[in-house]
From Swiss-Prot:
One of its GO terms (biological process) is tRNA modification. It catalyses: L-aspartate(89)-[ribosomal protein uS12]-hydrogen + (sulfur carrier)-SH + AH2 + 2 S-adenosyl-L-methionine = 3-methylsulfanyl-L-aspartate(89)-[ribosomal protein uS12]-hydrogen + (sulfur carrier)-H + 5'-deoxyadenosine + L-methionine + A + S-adenosyl-L-homocysteine + 2 H(+). [4Fe-4S] cluster 1 binds at residues 36, 72, 101. It comes from Ruegeria sp. (strain TM1040). SUPFAM superfamilies: Radical SAM enzymes. Its EC number is 2.8.4.4. Residues 154-397 form the Radical SAM core domain. Residues 1-27 are annotated as: Disordered. HAMAP family: MTTase_RimO (MF_01865). Residues 27-137 form the MTTase N-terminal domain. This is Ribosomal protein uS12 methylthiotransferase RimO.
Amino acid sequence: MTSNPPDLRPDLAPKPTFGTAPRPDQPTLGMVSLGCPKALVDSERILTRLRAEGYGISADYAGADAVIVNTCGFLDSAKAESLEAIGEALKENGKVIVTGCLGAEPDYIREHHPRILAVTGPHQYEQVLDAVHAAVPPSPDPFVDLLPATGVSLTPRHFSYLKISEGCNHKCKFCIIPDMRGKLASRPAHAVLREAEKLVTAGVRELLVISQDTSAYGLDRKYDVNPWKDGEVRSHITDLSRALGELAPADQLWVRLHYVYPYPHVRELIPLMADPENAVLPYLDIPFQHAHPDVLRRMARPAAAAKTLDEIRAWRAICPDITLRSTFIVGYPGETEAEFQHLLDWMDEAQLDRVGCFKYENVDGARSNDLPDHVAEEVKQNRWERFMEKAQAISEAKLASKVGQTLQVIVDEIDEDGIATCRTKADAPEIDGNLFIDEGTANLSVGDLVTVEVDEAGEYDLWGALR
């Protein structure tokens, strides 16, 4: 992965803590979760099922009877990281079960690590459980093995990823996710809302809505209507977002939307984000990938970059405080210097708030591998540096304009010196910036939503004082 990762990286988040110590003679398992938040949610579901069957969860290799490695296979660099993690687990523990996206290539994994116990593909929960049962038989004690209503969480207690669908119907040439995770399969709206309600009741202050294609949610279900409370809710991203934003008052809950593909109906979400009574944040994580129409066509992406600028202007007219985050690929096969300069010029016009970028690399099975005119590595690096220099300048100017403003922030961490690491509504965990409070934090707790006045700005971060 690059130093500015294109995806959320929950594996970089603080290490989770698990309830109580295992009871005597309780079988225990370890979990290594790599890749994106969708994989993290899969890990949480696997661990929740295993906890319900009486397994304990070990935070280290030594205390585990076996280790599950949930892999990533999106990029070749991610595959290498997954193989390294499998090797480490084998060395430190010896009993290893592999699952996740790289699990779709069992022969490839066994070629490198023939001693693994089993391999399963992504979101194949039952097969993972079968492999665990074979390696470490369960030993449940229903009077002792208590499980929280929200299941096992691998994130800090005040925020949680909420997966609303699996798979993707797009055929972007650089991506193999549809091959690994299949076509779009949306969860029923009432099932998503029930899970979200449990999380909020348990004290979660921020719901991060994720999927492979959030704005396509419900398309495969023909936007069916589901019963919810005293009424109904449609399986459509606008209706679902509105209902999520009504689970708690807007000063007590944040709902953040990620992976929002730039469909025309995204504009329906913007008035919701501008509504101060709804908890849906004015924040869109929307993967543009590039701006030049010819590059977008070679990617098999929507190629109307000029219309995208019009959409951005329309969004900001309705919701001036909206934060736009996006990711881009530089050095895509065939990308010329003129096409790259077009992207830089587009960035000047779009003025995106948060930007990630990564250099193109081949991925086994991706159609882009066979495109002509691959870009030299030194050219990719040069373009990445120039792109990030542009993005940094835009970020620095935008953050400087926030000095003197009063903002609501969520507290993520308080260190031993009393310095609080927080985030504004414009900042998603791990991938965006932070706001730091240096003093007066004695009465703060992780997860608090508080008001601060911004008194200093940097390239990506802010500093402020409680108000």
